[in-house]
Amino acid sequence: QFNHFDPSFLEETNDAAAQMSNAGVSMLDLRSNVGGYEEVAHQWINRYSHQRVFSTGVRYSVLPASLVASPSTSKTPRASNDNILILLSGKCSASCAEITLDLSYNLDNSLIIGENTNGSMISNSGHIELPNSKCSVDMTFSTVYLTPDGSDYFEELRGFFPDIWVPAKEAETLA
């Protein structure tokens, strides 16, 4: 079970990825992972797959307006992978855990089992109250996550769809 992408455990995280990459079938439990440091997620999947794995989406910085990662005009390349990687997802899988799932969409032989994720890819959000309506909203002070046109595999507040939807409590047993 991987609950947080914490940079202080980067070495242990990378060691676990290397160990899992040698197994024919591995399972990464992200059901209670609320996010963390994005670089840890990228390093984990790259270490697991022994290659660079690309995300389909792109992060766009709102202050100042600029792309954090350049959008590709061509199709995102798939990363080959001979082993099976099962990722467990749930409603608490958020932020950086969702980035890991996005990366896994481009990794051969990966399978996401569980529930839709949290749908919170906006980075560094803050709670504000609108002055006239007094409605409470969360807004990002950093970046938003954009998916390719026509793509419906992720949406803010709805999350990522798993490949196989099962109740999160049962995902590990049914995997």
Each language-model region and where it sits:
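Short acidic catalytic loops
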Residues: 1, 19-36, 86-88
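STAS-typified acidic loop motif
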Residues: 1-9
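Extracytoplasmic/secreted envelope proteins and their assembly/folding machinery
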Residues: 10-17, 41-45, 85, 97-101, ...
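Loop/turn elements at helix/coil->beta-strand transitions in domains of secreted/extracellular proteins
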Residues: 21-26, 51-54, 80-85, 107-111
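Surface-exposed patches in mature extracellular/periplasmic domains of secreted proteins
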Residues: 30-31, 55-61, 113-116
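Gly/Ser/Thr-rich loop/hinge elements
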Residues: 35-84, 122-134, 141-145, 156-157
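Extended C-terminal subregions enriched in glycine
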Residues: 84-106, 111-120
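BRCT (BRCA1 C-terminal) domain core and associated BRCT-interaction motifs
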Residues: 112-172
